[in-house]
A protein has these predicted regions:
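Short, solvent-exposed loop/turn elements at beta->coil junctions and helix N-caps
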Residues: 13-15, 115-119
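Acidic, metal-coordinating catalytic segment for phosphate/diphosphate chemistry
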Residues: 13-52, 58
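Active-site-adjacent beta-strand/loop module that shapes the phosphate/pyrophosphate-binding cleft
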Residues: 28-33, 119-139
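Short aromatic/basic micro-patch
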Residues: 78, 129, 153
């Protein structure tokens, strides 16, 4: 038997915390089916929207970064990315800004290759992924705040081995390379919502 999943109706919303990088909200919502008129509490994190970019040089190397991540207390291998700041006119602009700030690299064109919702059970944001071909370094990185980043150039055809071996574990980076594969195979045309 097939049935349609309906949206829940939010009846209350209370901000619990307002941190620098996210706010936390408790929402009370009515279940549309099943236990009629029964309300449940849900907690939602509201971080900024995010972006990341796969920069590939003319000689086929991916510009990765290594940085320490406090959530897992380890150094991770990632691609450049970060928050879409309120003053950024678009996530594409933010991706170019993050690429430049974190690596000193630029690209003539950033191509949108996909959008994901990092954790829709708990978070309200999305992450847009861009491809930057012919990326070239024009200066040293300009780190801001608590950033401590090392650039690492890796041959594009080595990336699957890094993923399979567990050297790359950041979910948004894994999704980015999946988007790249779809883009290269020309399966569909992604569009931001």
């Amino acid at each position: 038997m097939s049935r349609e999943i309906l949206p829940w109706r939010k009846i209350e919303s209370h901000k619990i915390a307002d941190c620098k990088v996210f706010s936390l909200e408790r929402n009370r919502a009515l279940m549309p089916t099943g236990e009629a008129n029964r309300a449940f509490d849900f907690y939602v994190l509201h971080p900024s929207h995010w972006c990341n970019v796969i920069p590939i040089t003319d000689d086929g190397r991916v510009v990765f970064i290594e940085q320490y991540r406090h959530g897992i207390e380890k150094v991770t291998l990632e691609i450049p990315g970060g928050a879409v700041d309120p003053e950024d006119p678009s996530s594409q602009y933010a991706a170019g800004r993050e690429l430049f700030e974190e690596t000193g690299f630029v690209a003539n064109e950033l191509t949108f290759i996909g959008r994901n919702h990092p954790n829709p059970a708990l978070q309200s944001n999305f992450c847009d992924t861009f491809l930057a071909r012919a990326a070239k370094q024009v200066c040293e990185p300009t780190f801001k705040g608590a950033e401590d980043i090392k650039i690492k150039l890796v041959e594009l055809d080595e990336v699957p081995n890094l993923i399979a071996s567990g050297a790359i574990t950041h979910a948004l980076v894994l999704v980015a390379f999946y988007f790249l594969q779809i883009h290269e195979l020309k399966i569909g045309t992604p569009k931001p919502e």
